[in-house]
Amino acid sequence: MSVINVEHISKLYGDKMILEDLSCSVDEGDKIGIIGINGTGKSTLLRIIAGEEEADEGKIIFSNGMTIGWMGQNPEFDEESSILKYVCEGKKIEDDYGYESDAKAMLTVLELENFDEKIKNLSGGQKKRAALCKVLLQKPDILI
């Protein structure tokens, strides 16, 4: 069963056609990769699917109730924030649903168990893992 249907997507930047009449579908359980040379619309397509950007033409259709988790190429960070505060941003840290304990468990798996460490002290790879944790904690049906 298709969970994402991309139908006739086109995107123009200035006078350059980045995506032209692109159609494809993603079935439940699929893991896909998009490859190509620079400037061919890979990131643009993903941003359109994630709702971060609008297509000039076409549409994206999702199965009912599907949620999207988006981790862009350059996530934004509050460099003074702790790792735990960053991944729980927008959530009550100590809520009745165990969000903080879920966050700590996932951060430990991702080898970021120093929860009070400031984001500014992390390496690039550690920052990417923190951003991934933040997205995964939302329990999206689809991760982009």
Region roles according to the model:
Residues 1-144:
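ABC ATP-binding cassette signature C-motif
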